Amino acid sequence: MDIQEEYMPFRAYQTYYRVVGDLRSPLTPLLLLHGGPGSTHNYFEAFDQLAMATGRPIVMYDQLGCGRSSIPTDPHLWQAATWVAELRALRAYLKLDCVHLLGQSWGGMLALIYLCDDQPRGIQSVILASTLSSAHLWAREQHRLIQFMSTTDQAAIHQAEMTGDFTTPAYLAANERFMIQHATGPITEQTPEFLRRSKRLGTAAYTTAWGPNEYFPTGTLRDYDYTAKLAQLPYPTLVTSGVNDLCTPLVAKTMVDQLPHAEWTLFPHSRHMAFIDEPAAYQARLTQWLAAHDEVTDD
């Protein structure tokens, strides 16, 4: 399977992208939007197996501010409009006239902003993976999950939120336990190489756009709420999430209830990255979904 790694000029910067397979394939490409902001494409290399098994081309990229893309120092860049413009530019640059669009976590937010505000053509289907339509609901659900932690961890998190100091050992340990429970990790020798590989995280992009952690949005995305806009989306949409996900069943169902053409698959043994926690089951469901919607066209 051919893998092409190149750079796209974007404004005064460069965006790294990675294409697995042949974009001339009769199968519609799958375009992947990673989370964060600032988490890089690396974990999406799990989808290389899908490309190899089906022949479907897959496109992934590092959004501006992380990974192998440029990491500017201008904090004003870290807002949704920048990444939407980059997504538009990438589709045009690679001539991705028709795509299946998958966004995970923040990538799903980016997808929803793009779809609702731009109403783009050529979207065969949408996959919203462990994402959200409301920052307020997300924060509320994370704090509900925190209530199931030890009283010591709850106190450390509460203290950090009250003081704005997210550097204490007690808080850092509590946050790590929370993320292992609901997101990803720990990293071991058995962890796939693409997850163990060092990467340039977009820390500035994350903290400026979202906040200090998953449950305390304070950045430019803090008022994000597209729930009421979901009803206008005409695209077939698959929502995926895990039972132990940051994207709780309430967060996922809130989207499903508003989307007019949605299906929801809840993975019973997964956290925030079901394609990592249950790769075979996720690949099977996604392969089925993509094949079923390849013939849908944007008239």
Curated annotation (Swiss-Prot):
It is found in: Cell envelope. InterPro entries: AB_hydrolase_1, AB_hydrolase_fold, AB_hydrolase_sf, Peptidase_S33, Pro_imino_pep. Its EC number is 3.4.11.5. Signal peptide: none annotated. Keywords: Aminopeptidase, Hydrolase, Protease. One of its GO terms (molecular function) is aminopeptidase activity. Belongs to the peptidase S33 family. PANTHER family: HYDROLASE, PUTATIVE (AFU_ORTHOLOGUE AFUA_2G14860)-RELATED, MONOACYLGLYCEROL LIPASE. Releases the N-terminal proline from various substrates. This is Proline iminopeptidase. The gene is pip.
